[in-house]
């Protein structure tokens, strides 16, 4: 069509064409009709009716084309339409067959037709619309032109046709109506009440109706017009072109539909919104939005009135029926009158002139304006109605913008409407339009089926609203039709407006069914159907009954795009049942009976609800107070709510994380009160039991008891421990651990196995206190396991396995430990000597220990620990007992035993908890050397001791040195700050020592079953050398090795156990560890280095300590780099936790070395100094005039000395780094 149009008249030459057309056609009738058309057209042109240029401008804007192009295109369309009109008119004037008409058209060509701007315009519009989808922007421009041309042509053509085939008055009225409607459409478009596409669709519908009715042989004329519109067979025989054109037009429309779907949807949405406010104006609104309803009504009513007047009975009934039937009177009437027209066409032009007139009137697009006016006014257009109206107007072809969809629907609607109305014309129309193109018929059937489906579904949802609107429509004269149209109307709104309604409605719900609907009749109906299904289906039945993975409360309103059919509309406070939580962040859930997607950022997951289902059930089972729903609830019950901020700040927001809490975590969280620690650990155990044991009620009970004990300080029996006495004494589970080690062992094993995975979560524990507590508990457990191994294997195993479950191991009170102490002869080794003695007992196990450690690290620490504990207990019972005693003493006498505890802790740490970290350092620094190992162990122990006394601070610092500290803490039940996270990290990374002292400790204990693994294996992940060193060291330090051996096997000393092999070395390492942490911290303070600031810690708490700084500190403090790195990270973590910031322990030296620790882009002198580990000279060099990076290469020994740097090693470092320094592309002055 475009080509034809372009060929016909690239430039607007309406007049020339008009003249030939007039010459060709009976001039009188044509001139009369044309004169009327031109009057209307001129009214539009002169602005009285509206400005065509405005419309053209809008089209130009709409299609992103030049105004001139649009005008040209419109002119071309107009000319084409004129030629078509001439062709049609000729057939009309002398009723001829389609062939005759097509022949005439061919002979006449487009030029032969009288140029009726209206007719042409309409055709062009039609054409342009149909072309819109398939044509490019250029086509669109042309379309715009055609739109205007069609506008005029249609009007003129209608006049001519009417004059020819019908009374001029009728024609005039028809034309007037079309003009009015066009003006209204233009005004509506101008006012943005409707989109250009909608206007085009209406014009097309009008044209189609027009052609059908205006042509004496409606079928012929419409066919001709259709071909013309298609432009595929403009000069070809109209018959063939009609069928083919119809098909092609359909497809073009479908294509266009797809293109215009978005706009149509938007329109529909707008219309829907308009329609919602005024449901009664629906019919009129089909063409316009509610505001324009009156105008449209006037336009349509004007046209309609005329048709009614002229056709009186035939058209009116159809219109009434159509109106009532169709949500949009115009569309229904169009369909009806279109059908009538086609019927007329089908009949003979001459035969059905009376009919034709009525159909024409109806076809006059505005034939039913009067009726419609009332109807329109009475009800607001529904978007569906609007679409219908447009579709019926375009009647299958005319609607190019939503066109195809609308047309098919309108056809169906029209058919249905007319059928109910009992219109022959409708049937004929259907036949004429449908029968020629098989595809159309199939589409019609599809549309019908879709409508049926949509009606069924949507009627339920929208039955009330739609019925109201429909009632307005149905209220119209044609009630019979309205009954059916009502449902159809419902369907239509669903298909079209429904889509839009849905999209509006669902746009609220985040689902827009419209998007699919307008794409194509079938597609749109299908998508509509689907969307309706999801929406309507929800009302009918829950769309999803399957399992939910949780619930979430919406905290932020979210209204999805109307094109987003999958998203849910979220309103604050809505509770969404989560169906799936993909990692991408777009979750799926059920809300308001609609399954859709939503972004997790808009909701708060209700952990309580997710976790509660199990717990509540358990609680109910127990009949005791329900299980706590949140950490806050839990802490409230155990009267420890003062720790709530600590837990929340450190990542223990939910019970799943909280139940991973361990003693070392308590240490890190700086929760040092033994009672609090015991209660917390007991609560953790109970939570774990709830989850792991079917007898959750018992666990709950224990929890309650534990809480009671805490609050009432009354003995509590967790049920895990054999003696309530132990629980009483320790309120931690140490006594019970010893007594119930065997019983808890299995539980602990299960916990341990499940916990290793949890440890990573534990590391989340942000509070140094919590970690320390956990560590202490673990140490206690670890020591207890060691002790138990020596004396009480089952107890030890239980302790190691039940780290969490066995807060007992942390026994806060000496009594608790003492209770179990009897297990072994070591009554309470307060001093390292005692521990050493124990170690001696376990001397034989040193190698075993290291092996265990290595295995444990790789394996799940807990499991291994359990096994190891079992294995070691035989040979290490005494040592374990001593360890336990020491721990119990420490727990019972934290202050006085502090030193002893530290020693014990050191031993314990060496054995199970601290050793992991210490060992890695020692291993790395002095892997083969026993003394080195011992020293490291001792350092770690000292650190652990320091941590215990220091509290979280050291514990936190000890996160890197946490291996030692934490290990120690566990045994002494003093909290080394290394978080459980670290231990896990170690296991996961294979480097347990530095990265996660806690984790290694736990893993080692747990991994003790892997005692066969050599110490080197244990540390091997991170510091294989230390492990090896430990092995040799273990034998050398006979006493320590037993401890270590015990720990590895029972608690799987973990890497550190190997490290700590010798008790003496442990003492030394303990002392050194404690001293090293204090020394490191003091040195950092003296140098003004804040490890909590960038680049040492990023905003997420990750470690960024430069390797150069670690190396320098190792040199300055004459300590192994590994120990220094661990201590520095522990200090960093401790400080971060004190600030209630996130703290992620690093993997220690190996991790630091793995990633360049330079601040990244060195942009200033300060950055450079930080990267080389000498940040304290920033101000010194700045004062000396070295403030920019460009001056770095010029640094010299004398300059540095003059600047006041006296440390020779530092000067050498600075000069070396300055020589290696390369200026960045754009250095910035500091």
Curated annotation (Swiss-Prot):
Chief localization: cytoplasm
Domain of life: Eukaryota
Domain SH3: 547-608
GO terms under biological process: positive regulation of angiogenesis; positive regulation of endothelial cell migration; positive regulation of lipopolysaccharide-mediated signaling pathway; positive regulation of non-canonical NF-kappaB signal transduction; positive regulation of p38MAPK cascade; protein polyubiquitination; regulation of protein autoubiquitination; regulation of protein K63-linked ubiquitination
Ranges of Low complexity composition bias in the record: 1-10, 324-336, 498-516, 1008-1019
Stretches for region Disordered: 1-30, 211-249, 275-337, 439-566, 610-633, 705-792, 818-875, 915-1045
Native organism taxonomy: Eukaryota, Metazoa, Chordata, Craniata, Vertebrata
Organism: Mus musculus
GO MF annotation list: mitogen-activated protein kinase kinase kinase binding; molecular adaptor activity; protein kinase binding
Keywords carried by this UniProt record: Cytoplasm, Phosphoprotein, Repeat, SH3 domain, Tumor suppressor
Protein name, as recorded: SAM and SH3 domain-containing protein 1
CDD domains in alphabetical order: SAM_SASH1_repeat1 (cd09559), SAM_SASH1_repeat2 (cd09492), SH3_SASH1 (cd11967)
Pfam families: SAM_1 (PF00536), SAM_2 (PF07647), SH3_2 (PF07653), SPIDER (PF12485)
Function summary: Is a positive regulator of NF-kappa-B signaling downstream of TLR4 activation. It acts as a scaffold molecule to assemble a molecular complex that includes TRAF6, MAP3K7, CHUK and IKBKB, thereby facilitating NF-kappa-B signaling activation. Regulates TRAF6 and MAP3K7 ubiquitination. Involved in the regulation of cell mobility. Regulates lipolysaccharide (LPS)-induced endothelial cell migration. Is involved in the regulation of skin pigmentation through the control of melanocyte migration in the epidermis.
Ranges annotated as biased composition (Polar residues): 461-470, 517-529, 737-758, 852-868, 962-972
Domain SAM: 626-690, 1160-1224
Ranges of Basic residues composition bias in the record: 615-624
Signal peptide as annotated in the record: none
Gene Ontology CC entries for this record: cytoplasm; membrane; protein-containing complex
């Amino acid at each position: 069509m475009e080509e034809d149009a372009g060929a016909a008249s690239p430039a607007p030459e309406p007049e020339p064409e008009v003249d030939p057309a007039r010459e060709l056609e009976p001039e009188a009738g044509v001139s009369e009709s044309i004169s009327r058309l031109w009057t209307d057209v001129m009214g539009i042109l002169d602005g009285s009716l509206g400005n065509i240029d405005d419309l053209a401008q809008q089209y130009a804007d709409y299609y992103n084309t030049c105004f001139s192009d649009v005008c040209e295109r419109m002119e071309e369309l107009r000319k084409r339409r004129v030629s078509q009109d001439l062709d049609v008119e000729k057939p009309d004037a002398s009723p001829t067959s389609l062939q005759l008409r097509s022949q005439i058209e061919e002979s006449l060509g487009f030029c032969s037709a009288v140029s009726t701007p209206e007719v042409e315009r309409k055709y062009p519009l039609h054409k342009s619309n149909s072309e819109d989808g398939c044509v490019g922007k250029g086509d669109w421009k042309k379309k715009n032109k055609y739109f205007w041309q069609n506008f005029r042509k249609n009007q003129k053509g209608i006049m001519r046709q009417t004059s020819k085939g019908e009374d001029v008055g009728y024609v005039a009225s028809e034309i007037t109506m079309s003009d009015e409607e066009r003006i209204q459409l233009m005004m509506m478009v101008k006012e943005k009440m409707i989109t250009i596409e909608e206007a085009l669709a209406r014009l097309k519908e009008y044209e189609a109706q027009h052609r059908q009715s205006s042509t004496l042989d409606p079928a012929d004329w419409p066919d001709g017009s259709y071909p013309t519109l298609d432009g595929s067979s403009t000069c070809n025989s109209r018959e063939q072109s009609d069928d083919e054109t119809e098909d092609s037009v359909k497809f073009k429309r479908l294509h266009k539909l797809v293109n215009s779907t978005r706009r149509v949807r938007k329109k529909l949405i707008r219309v829907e919104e308009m329609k919602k406010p005024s449901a009664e104006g629906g019919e009129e609104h089909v063409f316009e939005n509610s505001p324009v309803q009156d105008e449209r009504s006037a336009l349509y009513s004007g046209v309609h009135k005329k048709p009614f007047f002229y056709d009186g009975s035939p058209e009116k009934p159809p219109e009434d029926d159509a109106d009532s039937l169709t949500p949009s009177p115009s569309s229904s009437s169009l369909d009806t009158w279109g059908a009538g027209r086609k019927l007329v066409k089908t009949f003979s032009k001459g035969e059905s002139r009376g009919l034709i007139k009525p159909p024409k009137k109806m076809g006059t697009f505005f034939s039913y304006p009067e009726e419609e006016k009332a109807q329109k006014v009475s009800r607001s257009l529904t978007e569906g109605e609007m679409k219908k109206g447009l579709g019926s107007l375009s009647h299958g072809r005319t609607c190019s913008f939503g066109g195809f969809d609308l047309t098919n629907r309108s056809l169906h609607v029209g058919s249905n409407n007319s059928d109910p109305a009992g219109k022959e014309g409708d049937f004929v129309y259907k036949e004429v339009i449908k029968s020629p193109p098989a595809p159309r018929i199939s589409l019609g059937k599809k549309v019908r089926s879709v409508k049926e489906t949509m009606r069924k579904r949507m009627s339920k949802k929208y039955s009330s609203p739609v019925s109201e609107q429909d009632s307005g429509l149905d209220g119209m004269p044609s009630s019979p039709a309205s009954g059916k149209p009502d449902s159809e109307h419902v369907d239509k709104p669903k298909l079209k407006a429904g889509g839009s309604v849905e999209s509006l409605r669902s746009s609220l719900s985040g689902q827009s069914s419209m998007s699919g609907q307008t794409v194509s009749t079938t597609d749109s109906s299908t998508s509509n159907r689907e969307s309706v299904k999801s929406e309507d289906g929800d009302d009918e039945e829950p769309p999803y009954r399957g399992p939910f993975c949780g619930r979430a409360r919406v905290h932020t309103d979210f209204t999805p795009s109307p094109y987003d059919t999958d998203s849910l509309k979220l309103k604050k406070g809505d509770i969404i049942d989560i169906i799936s939580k993909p990692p991408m962040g777009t979750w799926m859930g059920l809300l308001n009976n609609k399954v859709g997607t939503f972004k997790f950022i808009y909701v708060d997951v209700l952990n309580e609800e997710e976790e509660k289902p199990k717990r509540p059930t358990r609680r109910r089972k127990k009949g005791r107070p329900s299980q706590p729903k949140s950490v806050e609830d839990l802490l409230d019950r155990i009267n420890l709510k003062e720790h709530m901020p600590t837990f929340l700040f450190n990542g223990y927001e939910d019970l799943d994380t909280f139940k991973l809490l361990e003693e070392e975590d308590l240490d890190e969280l700086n929760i040092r009160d033994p009672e609090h620690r015991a209660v917390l650990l007991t609560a953790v155990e109970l939570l774990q039991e709830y989850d792991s044991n079917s007898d959750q009620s018992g666990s709950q009970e224990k929890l309650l008891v534990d809480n009671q004990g805490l609050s009432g300080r009354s003995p509590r029996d967790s049920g895990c421990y054999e003696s309530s006495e132990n629980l009483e004494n320790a309120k931690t589970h140490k006594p019970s651990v010893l007594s119930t080690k065997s019983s808890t062992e299995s539980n602990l094993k299960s916990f341990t196995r499940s916990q290793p995975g949890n440890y990573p979560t534990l590391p989340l524990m942000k509070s140094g206190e919590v970690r320390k507590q956990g560590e202490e508990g673990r140490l206690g457990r670890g020591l207890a396991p060691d002790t138990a191994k020596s004396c009480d294997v089952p107890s030890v195993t239980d302790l190691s396995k039940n780290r969490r479950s066995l807060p007992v191991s942390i026994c806060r009170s000496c009594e608790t430990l003492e209770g179990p102490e009897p297990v072994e002869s070591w009554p309470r080794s307060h001093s390292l000597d005692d521990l050493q003695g124990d170690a001696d007992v376990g001397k034989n196990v040193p190698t075993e220990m290291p092996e265990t450690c290595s295995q444990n690290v790789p394996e799940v620490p807990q499991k291994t620990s359990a096994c190891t504990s079992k294995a070691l207990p035989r040979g290490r019972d005494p040592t374990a007992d001593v360890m336990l005693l020491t721990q119990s003493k420490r727990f019972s006498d934290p202050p006085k035993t502090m030193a002893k505890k530290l020693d014990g802790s050191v031993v314990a740490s060496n054995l199970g908890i601290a050793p992991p970290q210490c060992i890695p350092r020692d291993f790395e620094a002095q892997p083969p050397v026993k003394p080195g190992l011992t020293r490291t162990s001792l350092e770690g122990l000292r650190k652990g001791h320091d941590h215990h006394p220091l509290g979280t601070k050291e514990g936190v610092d000890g996160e890197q040195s946490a291996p030692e500290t934490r290990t120690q803490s566990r045994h002494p039940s003093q909290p080394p700050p290394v978080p459980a996270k670290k231990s896990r990290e170690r296991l996961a990374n294979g480097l347990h020592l530095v990265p996660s002292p806690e984790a290694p400790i736990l893993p080692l204990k747990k991994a003790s079953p892997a005692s066969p693994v050599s110490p080197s294996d244990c540390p091997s992940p991170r510091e294989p050398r230390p492990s090896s060193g430990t092995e040799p060291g273990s034998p050398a330090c006979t006493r320590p090795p037993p401890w270590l051996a015990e720990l590895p096997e029972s608690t799987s000393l973990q890497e550190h156990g190997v490290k700590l092999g010798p008790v003496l070395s442990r003492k030394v390492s303990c002392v050194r560890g404690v001293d090293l942490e204090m020394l490191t911290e003091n040195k950092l303070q003296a140098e003004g280095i804040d490890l909590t600031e960038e680049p040492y810690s990023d905003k997420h708490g990750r470690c960024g300590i430069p390797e150069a700084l670690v190396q320098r500190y190792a040199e300055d403090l004459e300590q192994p780099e590994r120990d220094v790195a661990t201590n520095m990270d522990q200090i960093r973590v401790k400080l971060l936790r004190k600030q209630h910031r996130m703290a992620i322990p690093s993997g220690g030296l190996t991790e630091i070395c793995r990633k360049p620790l330079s601040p990244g882009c060195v942009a200033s002198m300060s950055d450079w100094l930080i990267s080389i580990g000498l940040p304290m000279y920033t101000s010194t060099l700045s004062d000396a005039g070295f403030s920019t990076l460009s001056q770095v290469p010029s640094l010299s020994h004398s300059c540095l000395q003059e600047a006041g740097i006296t440390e020779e090693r530092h000067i050498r470092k600075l000069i070396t780094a300055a020589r290696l320094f390369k200026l960045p592309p754009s250095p910035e002055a500091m």
